[in-house]
Design a protein with these regions (language model features):
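Eukaryotic alpha-helical solenoid repeat scaffolds
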Residues: 1-209
Length: 209
């Protein structure tokens, strides 16, 4: 019993340490997204024209948005709710949930700012590709963990914003349309679908196509 008790205590300590690190990572990511949104707004408004390195800043902001969505937020929300890691993360109390909500709010602000840039500036392929994959990762996220306390309406707003972003890229960059369509179709065929009505299927947790 003493040994088992020690194992339990060690597990609790490891879980607490992991959540502390996750909390810090979420905080830093949220701050980075706020900076990215600021860069997007400055570029869209023309206030950044006098900054000689703004092209590099814009590229870095787009890359950061892609990493946060594709490699951070989406994998976190796509985890199986029954897995041990998910239980460790989402059973630590309200503070972490609040931090996640703040991160999602920052992601929404950043994604909302990008379409204005794509409409006004000719982005290079190096920037278009990460924007497309960032948008698609959100659109096809199953969000199985949103029922554990993270605001599902907030993430749905991010999903709609990502769709608008992808639509703007698709409309303005004809030379990129073929591979974008191929990636969308490849993502669709991986999702479970249930036919509800003629020519209408439900995929990705209830999304209609």
């Amino acid at each position: 019993m003493v040994k088992d008790g020690a194992v339990v205590d060690r597990g609790v300590n490891l879980a607490a340490e992991y959540c502390e690190r996750l909390d810090l990572a979420i905080l830093v990511s949220g701050l980075g997204l706020e900076v990215a949104a600021l860069v997007f707004d400055m570029v869209a408004s023309g206030k950044a024209l006098h900054i000689w390195s703004m092209g590099d800043l814009l590229h870095d902001a787009i890359a950061f948005l892609k990493v946060c969505l594709l490699d951070g937020i989406v994998p976190l929300l796509d985890m199986d709710a029954e897995c041990e890691l998910a239980q460790v993360i989402f059973n630590t109390g309200l503070p972490l949930h609040n931090r996640l909500r703040t991160l999602l709010e920052s992601a929404l602000a950043a994604t909302n700012s990008v379409p204005a840039i794509t409409a006004q500036h000719a982005l290079c392929e190096e920037d278009i590709v990460p924007l497309v994959y960032a948008s698609m990762s959100v659109m096809f996220c199953s969000t199985t963990l949103l029922s554990n306390g993270v605001d599902s309406n907030l993430f749905e707003s991010i999903r709609r914003s990502s769709q608008a972003l992808l639509r703007s890229v698709f409309e303005l960059h004809a030379d990129q349309r073929t591979w974008i369509l191929e990636e969308i179709l490849a993502s669709l065929v991986k999702l479970p679908a249930q036919k509800r009505a003629q020519s209408v299927h439900r995929v990705a947790g209830g999304k209609s196509v």
